[in-house]
Amino acid sequence: MSNIEERVKKITVEQLGVSEAEVKIDSSFVDDLGADSLDTVELVMALEEEFDTEIPDEEAEKITTVQAAIDYVTANQ
């Protein structure tokens, strides 16, 4: 597991209040982990802070799964 993957999963657990076992690479934040629109905004903000990056709204809308978050961070480091 990459460092980015570990950090994204940790943020997901903290922001959504789910167990680490529930967070799979292909988990959808909304469909699988029960996030609502406010949760997803807070998740994106936490990712921005953790990885010291700015995620434009049009890109944030595409980050719907754990893998999508990892891919975005990896591509924009």
UniProtKB/Swiss-Prot annotation:
The keyword Lipid metabolism applies. 4'-phosphopantetheine is transferred from CoA to a specific serine of apo-ACP by AcpS. This modification is essential for activity because fatty acids are bound in thioester linkage to the sulfhydryl of the prosthetic group. One of its GO terms (cellular component) is cytosol. Pathway: Lipid metabolism; fatty acid biosynthesis. Residues 2-77 form the Carrier domain. InterPro entries: ACP, ACP-like_sf, PP-bd_ACP, Ppantetheine_attach_site. Keywords: Cytoplasm, Fatty acid biosynthesis, Fatty acid metabolism, Lipid biosynthesis, Lipid metabolism, Phosphopantetheine, Phosphoprotein. The modification O-(pantetheine 4'-phosphoryl)serine is found at residue 37. One of its GO terms (molecular function) is acyl carrier activity. Belongs to the acyl carrier protein (ACP) family. This is Acyl carrier protein.
